A protein has these predicted regions:
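A domain-level signal for the structural core that forms small-molecule/cofactor-binding pockets
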Residues: 1-141
Length: 141
């Protein structure tokens, strides 16, 4: 979970997991919740996710994007939490292939975060932008 001080850098969430009970499975995902909409960044984020997913299975990105969009939809606000991402659970097709996918999800998140933060970390922000961020952050809960 990344909640930066700089409102120009979006909040970003990532997790992966391997659940081991009588049945074993992988789950996880990542999503982005910007305070300030940046359509170029949104396109970049989704392109990177799609590229990574397609290395494993061309069906993953549309399936996991849809799952994320539904999972992070806020019905009480009638809006999505952010700009989406991917989300999956109960993934137990082939352990070795699933584990490679999980590792790529983590590596891709680290790469995306590094690129976004590097691009925006020294950008100044206004008081109004900070207020927008605080409002969005309060709605994140």
């Amino acid at each position: 979970m990344l909640h930066p001080k700089n409102p120009k850098i979006p909040a970003m969430h990532f997790n992966t997991r391997f659940i081991c009970t009588k049945k074993n499975w992988f789950g996880g995902g990542m999503d982005v919740t910007p305070s300030l909409i940046d359509n170029k960044e949104k396109k970049y984020f989704h392109n990177e996710l799609k590229k990574m997913c397609n290395l494993h299975n061309k069906k993953y990105y549309p399936k996991y994007k849809k799952w994320c969009d539904e999972y992070f939809y806020l019905p009480h606000r009638e809006e999505p939490r952010g700009i989406g991402g991917i989300f999956f659970d109960y993934k137990m097709d082939d352990w070795s292939k699933d584990f490679l996918f999980i590792k790529d999800v983590g590596s891709t998140f680290a790469y995306i975060v590094k690129e976004i933060v590097k691009k925006k970390m020294f950008k100044k922000w206004t008081k109004k932008e900070k207020e927008i961020k605080l409002l969005k952050r309060g709605r994140y809960v």
